[in-house]
Curated annotation (Swiss-Prot):
The gene is ynaL. InterPro entries: YnaL-like. Pfam families: YnaL. It comes from the Bacteria. Induction: Expressed during stationary phase (at protein level). Residues 7-57 are annotated as: Disordered. Residues 11-35 have a biased composition (Pro residues). Residues 46-57 have a biased composition (Basic residues). This is Protein YnaL.
């Protein structure tokens, strides 16, 4: 019953003006910065013949 009343009332057009400010999206967590290089850098290459994974088998 009340929906019929709302349909009869014309909806006023939005008044052009300042746009509604959109809030900034939540920033994604930044990755950890690279640690300072040690004297012997850790090798991440899997091309080495003797890797820990092969030795563990």
């Amino acid at each position: 019953m009340t929906t019929l009343i709302y349909l009869q009332i014309p909806v006023p057009e939005p008044i052009p003006g300042d746009p509604v400010p959109v809030p900034d999206p939540i920033p994604r967590p930044q990755p950890m910065p690279d640690p300072p290089p040690d004297e012997e850098p850790i090798k991440l290459s899997h091309r080495e013949r003797r890797s820990a994974r092969i030795r563990a088998c």
